């Protein structure tokens, strides 16, 4: 192998190492922002929120009919949260909720949610959101062992009332659940 090939390989590896360093620096910056947003939402909430679970829907393409026929898709429950809107108009929330899961057993969840918010109409009360939630849940069929969750969020709302939703991905006969709730801001 001639010298130019060694230089090319060394240069390629060196550039990759520099890139990895930048990725970790950005990850550290992102985590700092994440922690600061949680702290600010906890310390300076603008609203108190009431959460009312509305629907759980198991994707029919991903389940046997005999399973979906047995599942609960009316998730009785409720929750409470703190929230705020940041200077960009994005929503931040801390919440705790408990609801009846697919097996009609209680499932608690608590976490932080963030949504980038758009107000596409002249009426500023109408808003759409897209973001994520990070938290912890526990299920009866997992012996209530705390499980971390990182899920997408989407919403449509008017004024203090928001219909918020997520999708829990999964495999055949497991996961693939649409879950939605109403959020009322006070």
From Swiss-Prot:
Changing residue 58 to F: Drastically reduces palmitoyltransferase activity while leaving expression and membrane insertion intact. The keyword Transferase applies. Residues 1-25 form the signal peptide. Changing residue 102 to A: Drastically reduces palmitoyltransferase activity while leaving expression and membrane insertion intact. It is found in: Cell outer membrane. Changing residue 58 to N: Drastically reduces palmitoyltransferase activity while leaving expression and membrane insertion intact. The record marks 172 as: Role in the phospholipid gating. The record marks 67 as: Role in lipopolysaccharide recognition. Its EC number is 2.3.1.251. SUPFAM superfamilies: OMPA-like (SSF56925). It catalyses: lipid A (E. coli) + a 1-hexadecanoyl-2-acyl-sn-glycero-3-phosphocholine = hepta-acyl lipid A (E. coli) + a 2-acyl-sn-glycero-3-phosphocholine; lipid IIA + a 1-hexadecanoyl-2-acyl-sn-glycero-3-phosphocholine = lipid IIB + a 2-acyl-sn-glycero-3-phosphocholine; lipid IVA (E. coli) + a 1-hexadecanoyl-2-acyl-sn-glycero-3-phosphocholine = lipid IVB (E. coli) + a 2-acyl-sn-glycero-3-phosphocholine. Induction: In magnesium-deficient conditions. Pfam families: PagP. GO terms for cellular component: cell outer membrane. Inhibited by lauryldimethylamine oxide (LDAO) and dodecylphosphocholine (DPC). Keywords: Acyltransferase, Cell outer membrane, Membrane, Signal, Transferase. Its main location: membrane. The active site is at 58, 101, 102. One of its GO terms (biological process) is lipid A biosynthetic process. It comes from the Bacteria. Homodimer. Belongs to the lipid A palmitoyltransferase family. Overproduction leads to camphor resistance and chromosome condensation. Transfers a palmitate residue from the sn-1 position of a phospholipid to the N-linked hydroxymyristate on the proximal unit of lipid A or its precursors. Phosphatidylglycerol (PtdGro), phosphatidylethanolamine (PtdEtn), phosphatidylserine (PtdSer) and phosphatidic acid (Ptd-OH) are all effective acyl donors. This is Lipid A palmitoyltransferase PagP. The gene is pagP.
């Amino acid at each position: 192998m001639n010298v130019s090939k060694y230089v090319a390989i060394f240069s390629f590896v060196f550039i990759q190492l520099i890139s990895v360093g930048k990725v970790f620096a950005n990850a550290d910056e992102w985590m700092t922002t994440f922690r600061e947003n949680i702290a600010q939402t906890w310390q300076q909430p603008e609203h108190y929120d009431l959460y009312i679970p509305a629907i759980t829907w198991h994707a029919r393409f991903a389940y046997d009919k005999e399973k979906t026929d047995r599942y609960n898709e009316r998730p009785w429950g409720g929750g409470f949260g703190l929230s705020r809107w940041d200077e960009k108009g994005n929503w931040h929330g801390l919440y705790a909720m408990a609801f009846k899961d697919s097996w009609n057993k209680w499932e608690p969840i608590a976490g932080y949610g963030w949504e980038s918010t758009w107000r596409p109409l002249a009426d500023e009360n109408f808003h759409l959101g897209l973001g994520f939630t990070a938290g912890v849940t526990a299920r009866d069929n997992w012996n209530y062992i705390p499980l971390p969750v990182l899920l997408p969020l989407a919403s449509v709302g008017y004024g203090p009332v928001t219909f918020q939703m997520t999708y829990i991905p999964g495999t055949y006969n497991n996961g693939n659940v649409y879950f939605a709730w109403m959020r009322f801001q006070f």
